[in-house]
């Protein structure tokens, strides 16, 4: 593929391009649907997601997947400090999600007014669209990434390959059930389900994104 801005040629497998395209397409559709969802339903999602993370039965498969990720990463000689899903990380995820649930933000809200007498200038908060994240291999990124739903955005993210099993388990066991329990479209939060680093390039090159955020360093987030 050729980058739209620079024209630089990158080797991105066709199946990776399709995986990214499908994820963004679902997020675009979900963004449109989210505009009709009441704020209370979005808050319910955050609360339900937090509840499921705190539920031992629901969280068990996630811990098992994380142990597999950690074991594989160690066998490859990689650092696992941020990869291992500790009780503190779990608690921080719950706290972050509950914070989003309680935060007094609306998707469409006037934030400032400058009065010039005969006329005025207003600033409004409104949804952006699809927000993309590329993260290193940290399982707690779900609490960070899903925060954009608070103001009516949808999200697509790619996580480092070391944490992909954990991410899949969180998605399947916790995230999707929380979305459905709250009545939100499944496409609201999309994981780019590919271990290929090139998926990050394909994601950030998609013109349908409203905002792209990279967290970390090196080629894993490049």
Regions found by a protein language model. Give the residues of each.
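Conserved small-residue-rich beta-alpha loop and adjacent elements
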Residues: 95, 99-182, 210, 221
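Short, ordered loop/turn segments at secondary-structure junctions
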Residues: 39, 160-162, 194, 217-218
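Secondary-structure boundary motif
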Residues: 36, 55, 180-181, 205
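Short helix-terminating capping/connector loops at secondary-structure junctions
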Residues: 183-187
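Conserved NAD(P)+-binding/catalytic subdomain of aldehyde/semialdehyde dehydrogenases
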Residues: 130, 190-222
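N-terminal Rossmann-like NAD(P)+-binding subdomain of aldehyde/semialdehyde dehydrogenases
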Residues: 1-122
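Well-ordered alpha-helical segments embedded in enzymatic catalytic cores
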Residues: 19, 141-144, 198-199
């Amino acid at each position: 593929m050729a980058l739209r801005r620079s024209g630089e040629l990158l080797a991105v497998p066709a199946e990776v391009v399709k995986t990214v395209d499908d994820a963004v397409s679902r997020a675009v559709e979900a963004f449109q649907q989210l505009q009709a969802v009441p704020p209370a339903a979005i808050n319910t999602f955050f609360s339900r997601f937090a509840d499921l993370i705190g539920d031992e039965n629901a969280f068990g498969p996630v811990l098992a997947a994380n142990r597999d990720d950690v074991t594989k990463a160690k066998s490859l000689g990689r650092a696992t400090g941020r990869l291992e899903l500790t009780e503190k990380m779990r608690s921080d995820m719950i706290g972050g999600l509950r914070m989003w649930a309680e935060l007094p933000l609306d998707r469409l809200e006037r934030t400032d007014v400058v009065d010039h007498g005969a006329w005025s200038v207003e600033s409004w908060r409104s949804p952006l669209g699809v927000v993309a994240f590329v993260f290193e291999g940290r399982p707690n990124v779900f609490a960070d990434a899903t925060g954009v739903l608070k103001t009516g955005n949808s999200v697509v993210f790619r996580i480092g390959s070391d944490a992909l099993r954990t991410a899949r388990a969180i998605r399947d066991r916790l995230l999707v059930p929380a979305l459905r329990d709250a009545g939100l479209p499944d496409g609201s939060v999309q994981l780019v389900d590919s271990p290929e680093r090139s998926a990050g390039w394909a994601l950030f090159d998609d013109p349908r994104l409203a905002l792209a955020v990279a967290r970390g360093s090196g080629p894993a987030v490049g």
